[in-house]
Amino acid sequence: YLVEHEPDFEPVRTRMIVTPQYLRIDDGRDGGDFLLYHRGERTIYNVAASDTLIIVIAPQTVKAAPIPLEHRIEPDAAEAPAVGGKTVRHYRLLTNRDTCYDLYAADGLLPEVVTALREYRESLAGEHAQALAFTPKEMQTPCDLANNIYAPARHLAHGFPIRMDESTGPDGARVRTTELLDYKQGFAADEALFRLPEYRRITIQELRRR
């Protein structure tokens, strides 16, 4: 269970359920909207219950970055309070001298979740890359390009993120803070949570052409 904060918006609570086959992301309720990532297919299904629609996002190739990107990590020697018996450390992840992530991560915590999130982020990067053609140049900042396309899983290289501030806008603007609230392991999730409803399906490319 996570909570996300963005400027001028109410905090949003998120639930992630991870199995060897799937990653499901929702608001903590079993009905309604949810995102399902099929790990074997590397395909994302965005389910919109109110529209009875499923948007299908298949993996796509990521081409070269439009500008040079230089990544750097600045670790902090100080330790934060441990989580789940795992040491938490502080890092700043930079691209072209801009701070893109201010990160507290627990190395060795929930490794199966870290792996699933890495797969999901890398699969989603292809769609973000395709969307560059429709993104204003001023929004294609080094952090936006790095975080979403060219280094989409770098914040997972240090363990599970306990808290992270993400900046993608110019001069560190558009900050989103994500924090871990709670977690549990070893339970049997209802298989119905990983079944897609009989809704109309449309690919993200078809949706964009509308």
Short names for language-model regions:
Residues 1-210:
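Extended soluble regions of mature proteins
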